[in-house]
Regions:
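Small-residue-rich hydrophobic membrane-insertion segments
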Residues: 1-29, 123-222
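Membrane-inserting hydrophobic helices used for pore formation or membrane fusion
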Residues: 326-352
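Proline-rich intrinsically disordered, low-complexity coils
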Residues: 2-4, 9, 94, 107, ...
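Amphipathic, membrane-inserting segments
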Residues: 46-98, 198-199, 204-330
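Glycine-rich, hydrophobic membrane-spanning regions of integral membrane proteins that mediate transport
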Residues: 101-122, 134, 138
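N-terminal amphipathic alpha-helical segments
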Residues: 16-45, 222-235, 239
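Glycine-centered secondary-structure boundary/capping sites
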Residues: 85-92, 178, 336, 340
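Extended, low-complexity, charged alpha-helical tracts
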Residues: 29, 36, 40-43, 47-54, ...
């Protein structure tokens, strides 16, 4: 039945109130949805920034420790020229036999090879001053001995690397080693320093776009906010899983690097004392004929040669093995590192 005319204004008013209430409710729900989306977006951005700060800290710390190891290896190899200069003055010296004991084998002394690696290491050391953070660590990742030998190779331009100076020689060597554990390192060193060792140790692809959540999505506002908030959170969570995997890897690499550094530092300390003793015999005392050496002097000389071989082998170890799949993290060469440490300790226990 139609409403009486006098009731129509009241009915219209009631309908308006009801509609207004419904609209207000929808507005409240819409506002809450927007606030929730905004909160989600802010939380995702904040958490991602914390994750990236964690990654940068781990990467920088590991890079510095790898640099420390790489620099020590190059310094050791470069010091072989000093040994060679003194040792070559000794006349009538015998051919020292290859050390083979307790499962440990060391190479027979090769004067030419020692000189070559020493010169190459000197070339690389000369370029470290102008190189970015992570370059020396990249050499440790690939094996400093290999890098030093490559430093005497030929650059892609046809120029002998050893004829280049400073960072140019270092970069040419990095490029020469590009197919190995150092893939992407030269570009990384030029672009951002600390990322260089990460690219060498992790694989360049690992440090690519998948690690980062684009800043654009975090800046979305207005009507698209609610649609993008969940997407931003999902991207952050995906990046977080990858960052955590990388950070765990960096911690493991740092631990392996530091352990190797300790053993290398210990062996080098013994080598330096023996080298100083040999210099004293040959240079200060003027003993340059093996036939006039005392038994103690002969033992010291033989042990110094042995230490050169041990250090040469230790500096050959690649700390990182390049992954066959560029999207995978590289492998820490723990077996080779542990074997090298064990061999060094066995030789020290046997001879020193």
């Amino acid at each position: 039945m139609p409403l009486p005319i006098w009731l129509i204004p009241v009915a219209l008013k009631g309908a308006a109130i009801a509609a207004g209430a419904a609209g207000a409710g929808a507005a409240v729900r819409g506002a809450k949805k927007m606030k929730d989306a905004d909160d989600t977006m802010k939380a995702a951005k904040s958490r991602h920034e914390r994750n990236m700060a964690k990654f940068k800290k781990e990467n920088e710390t590991t890079t510095k420790d790898m640099d420390k190891l790489g620099k020590l290896e190059l310094e050791i190899l470069h010091s072989f020229s000093e040994f060679s200069d003194v040792f070559e003055q000794i006349k009538n010296r015998p051919t020292f036999e290859t050390y083979s004991k307790n499962g440990v084998s060391l190479p027979q002394y090769d004067g030419e090879k020692i000189k070559e690696v020493s010169v190459g290491a000197g070339v690389l050391l000369g370029g470290l001053g102008g190189a970015g953070l992570g370059v020396a660590g990249g050499f440790a990742a690939a094996g400093a001995t290999t890098a030093a030998v490559m430093a005497l190779g030929t650059a892609s331009t046809g120029t002998a690397i050893a004829s280049l100076s400073g960072a140019a020689a270092t970069n040419a060597t990095l490029a020469f080693l590009g197919g190995g554990a150092l893939g992407g390192l030269a570009a990384g060193g030029a672009a951002g320093g600390g990322m260089a060792a990460g690219a060498a140790a992790l694989g360049a692809a690992t440090l690519g776009v998948g690690l980062l959540v684009g800043g654009i999505i975090f800046s979305v506002t207005g009507g698209k906010l609610s649609d993008k908030a969940d997407e931003a959170w999902a991207q952050m969570a995906k990046a977080e899983r990858k960052i955590n995997t990388i950070c765990n890897y960096l911690v493991d690499l740092r631990s392996t690097s530091n352990k190797y550094y300790e053993t290398l530092f210990k062996v080098n300390g013994i080598y330096k004392r023996h080298l100083n003793g040999l210099k004293s015999i040959v240079t200060m005392l003027g003993h340059t004929d093996w036939n006039t050496f005392t038994p103690e002097e002969k033992t010291l000389t033989e042990n110094t040669v042995l230490l050169v071989g041990l250090l040469y082998n230790m500096c050959k170890v690649e700390l990182v093995l390049k992954s066959k799949n560029e999207n995978d993290i590289n492998t820490i060469n723990k077996v080779a590192v542990e074997t090298s440490i064990s061999n060094a300790n066995a030789v020290l226990a046997d001879k020193f």
